[in-house]
Amino acid sequence: MRVIVKIGTSSLTSDSGEVNMSALSKLVSEVVAARTQEHEIVVVTSGAITAGVQKLGIPRPDEPEILQALSAVGQIDLMRAYGEEFGSHGVATGQVLLAPHDFRDRNQYLHAETTFKHLLRLDVVPI
């Protein structure tokens, strides 16, 4: 069975906006346990903007363009944290970034679907 796990910002970050490694470790352990029950797991995560805001030490802005830039900054640390936690269980991860056009355009959609299938066949957790 394929299972999609959505991990929200409040589940990943402390009140100060830092990635809460203890919480992340627990979530990853639960995902790893589900994988041992023959489930294919895909993780959908939030938290990149909050991680970017914390890293740069600035107040959270409202402008979409700046939020996107902060997401780019925070995404690196977030994926590093996921990679380290899953790696401690011997599980590889792969980053998949999707945009709205990946769902609207049939070719883009099929390309994304193929990528997910290959990652799962390689026993990689797509994030």
Specify the residue positions occupied by each region the protein language model found.
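Nucleotide/pyrophosphate-binding catalytic subdomain
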Residues: M1-I127
